[in-house]
Every structure is written in structure tokens, then in C-alpha cells.
Amino acid sequence: MRPQVGGIYPWPYDGPWSASETALVIVDMQQDFLAPDGWFAATGGDPSSFTRILPNVAKVLSCARKIGMPCFFTIEAHRPDLSDVPATKQWRARRLGRGIGEAGPLGRALIRGEAGCAIADPIAPKSGEPVVAKPGKSAFIASDFDQLLRHARIRNLVFAGITTDGAVQCTLR
């Protein structure tokens, strides 16, 4: 019999935990947000608050890989033709200093395939680890993330990345 939590329901609620049925999801740890010459910095943001967590994210990733936990990565990345960028999102980005798709030191900002969408080296995906490009905050909207998780028979998610009150929270909800 599984232990009870306050006599209300069995714990763990969803049955025994398994690393193979749990995925680590690394959210938006890409150069456009982390690099001093990336999109976030160009809009007046300070990427040091993001780069400061890189060592801890790298430790979590290393541990997950050691125990055989599948690892997934997300990036905020738009189509080169900008067809998935709502006008209001583009308006906000331009007001901050650089619109989505505008050229910068890392290529066109937040565009799939550009250098700014590369995940930071200390936590770069290994061959076979999926990278989910998403045009918004949630990895479940306008992407194949749900299908990838179902195909891998993932039942539980562990999150690391940026920002907790943005893309991380939107994805976990």
C-alpha cells in the first residue's frame, strides 16, 4: 500500500516515479536571451540574471542524463517570414528597441535557425535530444511538444530555465 498524505489520497498520486517516464524540460536558455549581444540585451534587459543560473541548470541536466531521464529543450523561435508573430508582439518588441526578425550580432532576432536561437554551450542538447521551437510562451502552443512527450511516454515533467513567471509557468500550466 502506498503512503497516505494527510489521509486524503495515496502519494505519489500518479503511482511510482520513474526517470524514464519523467522528462527534464530546459526552457528558453538560448543566446538571444543569454548573450550580452543578444536580443534581450538589445532591448535593455540584463542577461546576467539569466546567465547566473547556467551552472545550476548544467548540474541538473548532467544529473538527469546520468539517470536516464529524457531531456527536452525549448526555444522561442519564429518563422523567417514572421507569419507567426502577432502584430501586438512585434509592436512591443519594437518599442523595446529591436523587433522580432530584425538583424543583430546573432542574426535575425528570435528567428529559427539563427545563431541567437542556439542553446547556450554548457547545456547544449546532445544528439537525439529534441529542441522544440515555439512562437510564444507555452511550449504546448503551436508546436509538436505534446506529440513528442506522448511518443516518449512521458508522464511527469521537471522544469529548468527562464523565465519562471513567463515561459516556464506558461508551459507547466
Predicted regions and their residues:
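Active-site acidic carboxylates
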Residues: 1-125
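Cysteine-centered nucleophilic/redox motifs
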Residues: 159, 173
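Short glycine/serine/threonine-rich phosphate/pyrophosphate-binding segments
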Residues: 164-171
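Structural motif
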Residues: 74, 160-162
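Internal catalytic-core helix/loop-beta-alpha segment
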Residues: 109-158
